[in-house]
From Swiss-Prot:
This is Large ribosomal subunit protein uL2. The keyword Cell wall biogenesis/degradation does not apply. It comes from Chlorobaculum tepidum (strain ATCC 49652 / DSM 12025 / NBRC 103806 / TLS) (Chlorobium tepidum). Part of the 50S ribosomal subunit. Forms a bridge to the 30S subunit in the 70S ribosome. InterPro entries: NA-bd_OB-fold, Rib_uL2_dom2, Ribosomal_uL2, Ribosomal_uL2_bac/org-type, Ribosomal_uL2_C, Ribosomal_uL2_dom3, Ribosomal_uL2_RNA-bd_dom, Translation_prot_SH3-like_sf. GO terms for cellular component: large ribosomal subunit.
Length: 279
């Protein structure tokens, strides 16, 4: 996929770049796999803002994605590669031989007409899903389960993948996209290959309005606020001292730089071999 840069005809197009849609083969989604999305604007059921900087944006339908890939030993044909407004990756429409249709995350080099399958022992090819115990060491995998049967949770965004580094006993060792090395049960499933649309990270929005189309509202710096609105607000000029403003903080008073916030008693801590920030 190539990045399209626009001519600087207007200030908004001067720095804008767009994803190429060369790999997209179908413009209208599969109607049976769509559900409406209820807008929240970042508010919870009491009407209070719980997620800041959300609101507006273009209307969307949610595409139901098969993250579990649990339709074993039933071959499927890739019918189309589609755009999904809800994620950075492309999605692939599968037509199973028994007539069922499902969406999956589209890995790199998956093409219309390819045949893919899920199961305990299927071919080692891009798009096939199987337990980690049957995947060769050194393979690139995506859509990885952390709990058996729950569905993929790791490496699902554009260009993401993890590397199967080792297997020992009941656990496989994975190098995550963040650099973290952790253990996962060998019965957990993963899909062979790397998620496509890797150039997504190089896209420049070019103007504020494009963020608004995506449902992202403006962010105001804490230092630009009043003391009533933020722990870092107030003071004469660009003041950082006094009133709890000496150290950067979150809007709720939590130290923002360097403070470890992970619960030390979390059960999955023992499965992390090396943290993502370890040297």
């Amino acid at each position: 996929m190539a990045i399209r840069k626009l001519a600087p005809v207007t200030p908004g197009t001067r720095f804008a770049s767009y994803a190429g849609f060369d790999e997209i083969t179908k413009s209208t989604p599969e109607k049976s796999l769509l559900v409406p999305i209820k807008r929240t604007g970042g508010r919870n059921s009491t009407g209070r803002v719980t997620s800041r900087h959300m609101g507006g944006g273009h209307k969307r339908f949610y595409r139901i994605i098969d993250f579990k890939r649990n339709k074993d030993n039933v071959p499927a044909k890739v019918a189309a590669i589609e755009y999904d407004p809800n994620r950075s990756a492309r999605i692939a429409l599968l037509h199973y031989v028994d007539g069922e249709k499902r969406y999956i995350l589209a890995p790199k080099n998956l093409k219309v007409g390819d045949r893919i399958e899920s199961g305990e022992k299927v071919d080692i090819k891009v798009g096939n899903t199987m337990p980690l115990k049957n995947i060769p060491i050194g393979s690139d995998v995506h859509n990885i389960e952390l709990k058996i049967g729950k569905g993929g949770q790791i490496a699902r965004s554009a260009g993401a993948y993890a590397v199967l580094a080792a297997r020992e006993g009941n656990y496989a060792t994975l190098k995550m996209p963040s650099g973290e090395i952790r253990k996962v049960r060998i019965e957990c499933r993963a899909t062979i290959g790397v998620i496509g649309n890797a150039e997504h990270e190089n896209i420049s929005l070019g103007k504020a309005g494009r963020s608004r189309w995506l449902g992202i509202r403006p962010q105001t710096r804490g230092m630009a606020m009043n003391p009533v609105d933020h722990p870092m607000g107030g003071g004469e000029g660009k003041s950082k001292s006094g009133g709890g403003r000496k150290h950067p903080k979150s809007p709720w008073g939590q130290l923002a730089k360097g403070l470890k916030t992970r619960n030390k008693k979390k059960a999955s801590t023992k499965l992390i071999v090396r943290g993502r920030k370890a040297k």
